[in-house]
Amino acid sequence: MNRITCLVEDKPSHPLMGEHGLSLYIEGERDILFDTGQSSLFAENASILGLELGGADAAIISHGHYDHGGGLRHFMGINDSAEVFIGEGAFRRRYAVEDSVKRFIGIPEVKSERINFVGETLPLGDGYTILKDFGGRFGRPAGNRTLFMEAGSGLVPDSFQDEIVLVIESGREVHIITGCSHSGILNIVEAASQLFP
């Protein structure tokens, strides 16, 4: 049985504080931090809840946006042993562009031997799998149209090839833990259902 605790989301819930972003703590066969939000707030809220993140086995960063991986450096400072899983290309420079205004929304690159760049679906064991590459049969969210990444000397629409999700098998059930689902939630569900029929 897995227990999922939301450490960060947009709306605060007393006594926890909120910020734009997401961070979840999954306790089960493995203890996994899924996304960090944009700052150290995930750790502050975990402390309020009595959760010891120093004992987490792993961290997963769903994609290369500040509101999901901005606290990665802080996590690695409070946990000196957890492996970190992040999609290949997640540290590319990313921007939101609206009304000709360009705003950086990427995450600072972190270099460590503990960081594992995920290039394809990766079983972690104990019923946990990192899923990558989702196809596009169902299209993607309209909100993606303002999101770009650096390529050469310019910007191109973000392909979200770095996006990863966590799939948890629990008996006959399959649970999908995702960040923003920039690849499209229906595409993600279809990919998971093909891997876990």
Regions found by a protein language model. Give the residues of each.
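Conserved beta-strand hairpin/beta-sheet module of binuclear metal-dependent hydrolase folds
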Residues: 2-49, 159-177
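Active-site metal-binding loops of divalent metal-dependent hydrolases
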Residues: 8-11, 36-39, 64, 89-90, ...
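Pre-active-site segment of Zn-dependent metallo-hydrolases
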Residues: 30-58, 142, 149-151, 185-195
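Short hydrophobic-aromatic micro-motifs
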Residues: 32-34, 124-133, 175-178
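Active-site metal-binding motif and surrounding structural segment of the metallo-beta-lactamase
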Residues: 41-92, 193-197
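Short, charged, surface-exposed secondary-structure boundary motifs
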Residues: 66, 94-97, 186
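Metallo-beta-lactamase
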Residues: 90-164
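Active-site-proximal loop/helix segments of hydrolase catalytic cores
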Residues: 155-197
